[in-house]
Amino acid sequence: MSKHTNIPMFRIGIGYDVHRFDNINNDDSNTSITICGIKINYHKKIIAHSDGDVGLHALADAILGAVGCGSIGQHFPNTDKKWKNAESSHFVIEAQKKAQERGYIISNADIIIICEQPKIMPYALEMQHYIAQFTSIDPSFINIKATTTEKLGAIGRNEGIAAQAIVLCSQQY
């Protein structure tokens, strides 16, 4: 605990998101999915109410959890037309504002994208810098990584994509 307040100096949050892919294999070269703000050419689309960016959804969820503000689903429900096709950076920006209102900054973020395809790591650095552009997080404190499920389960059958994020929030001075 800080000497000067009753709020903890550090708080940790974890977030998770998953979305299904459509079952249509699109031969259209303009087909893409958005992960951590970066468009990636892919022959399937993500089924979602917003832009379906699992990486940014997990990040927003982690930030909200760290500062005790519930979940992304509570703040941006998929039943609200306001969020239809919304860009997920908005969710992260709003979550960061809630953290700041409670006296915290985001010190570190670690995001893992879980899918068989498409390959994520060629875009990791671009994703890291994109997230740094609209958050207070230094790019060197944003980590993007990817894994597969070794072809196990729905994600292993390439039916969808998931992400987990963990953040460390520090008390502002």
From Swiss-Prot:
<feature type="binding site">
    <location>
        <begin position="17"/>
        <end position="19"/>
    </location>
    <ligand>
        <name>4-CDP-2-C-methyl-D-erythritol 2-phosphate</name>
    </ligand>
</feature>
<feature type="binding site">
    <location>
        <position position="57"/>
    </location>
    <ligand>
        <name>a divalent metal cation</name>
    </ligand>
</feature>
<dbReference type="Pfam" id="PF02542">
    <property type="entry name" value="YgbB"/>
</dbReference>
<dbReference type="GO" id="GO:0019288">
    <property type="term" value="P:isopentenyl diphosphate biosynthetic process, methylerythritol 4-phosphate pathway"/>
</dbReference>
<dbReference type="GO" id="GO:0016114">
    <property type="term" value="P:terpenoid biosynthetic process"/>
</dbReference>
<feature type="binding site">
    <location>
        <begin position="49"/>
        <end position="50"/>
    </location>
    <ligand>
        <name>4-CDP-2-C-methyl-D-erythritol 2-phosphate</name>
    </ligand>
</feature>
<dbReference type="GO" id="GO:0046872">
    <property type="term" value="F:metal ion binding"/>
</dbReference>
<dbReference type="InterPro" id="IPR020555">
    <property type="entry name" value="MECDP_synthase_CS"/>
</dbReference>
<keyword id="KW-0479">Metal-binding</keyword>
<comment type="function">
    <text>Involved in the biosynthesis of isopentenyl diphosphate (IPP) and dimethylallyl diphosphate (DMAPP), two major building blocks of isoprenoid compounds. Catalyzes the conversion of 4-diphosphocytidyl-2-C-methyl-D-erythritol 2-phosphate (CDP-ME2P) to 2-C-methyl-D-erythritol 2,4-cyclodiphosphate (ME-CPP) with a corresponding release of cytidine 5-monophosphate (CMP).</text>
</comment>
<protein>
    <recommendedName>
        <fullName>2-C-methyl-D-erythritol 2,4-cyclodiphosphate synthase</fullName>
        <ecNumber>4.6.1.12</ecNumber>
    </recommendedName>
</protein>
<keyword id="KW-0414">Isoprene biosynthesis</keyword>
<feature type="site" description="Transition state stabilizer">
    <location>
        <position position="49"/>
    </location>
</feature>
<feature type="site" description="Transition state stabilizer">
    <location>
        <position position="148"/>
    </location>
</feature>
<feature type="binding site">
    <location>
        <begin position="147"/>
        <end position="150"/>
    </location>
    <ligand>
        <name>4-CDP-2-C-methyl-D-erythritol 2-phosphate</name>
    </ligand>
</feature>
<feature type="binding site">
    <location>
        <position position="19"/>
    </location>
    <ligand>
        <name>a divalent metal cation</name>
    </ligand>
</feature>
<comment type="pathway">
    <text>Isoprenoid biosynthesis; isopentenyl diphosphate biosynthesis via DXP pathway; isopentenyl diphosphate from 1-deoxy-D-xylulose 5-phosphate: step 4/6.</text>
</comment>
<keyword id="KW-0456">Lyase</keyword>
<comment type="subunit">
    <text>Homotrimer.</text>
</comment>
<comment type="similarity">
    <text>Belongs to the IspF family.</text>
</comment>
<feature type="binding site">
    <location>
        <position position="17"/>
    </location>
    <ligand>
        <name>a divalent metal cation</name>
    </ligand>
</feature>
<feature type="binding site">
    <location>
        <begin position="76"/>
        <end position="80"/>
    </location>
    <ligand>
        <name>4-CDP-2-C-methyl-D-erythritol 2-phosphate</name>
    </ligand>
</feature>
<dbReference type="GO" id="GO:0008685">
    <property type="term" value="F:2-C-methyl-D-erythritol 2,4-cyclodiphosphate synthase activity"/>
</dbReference>
<dbReference type="InterPro" id="IPR003526">
    <property type="entry name" value="MECDP_synthase"/>
</dbReference>
<feature type="binding site">
    <location>
        <position position="157"/>
    </location>
    <ligand>
        <name>4-CDP-2-C-methyl-D-erythritol 2-phosphate</name>
    </ligand>
</feature>
<dbReference type="InterPro" id="IPR036571">
    <property type="entry name" value="MECDP_synthase_sf"/>
</dbReference>
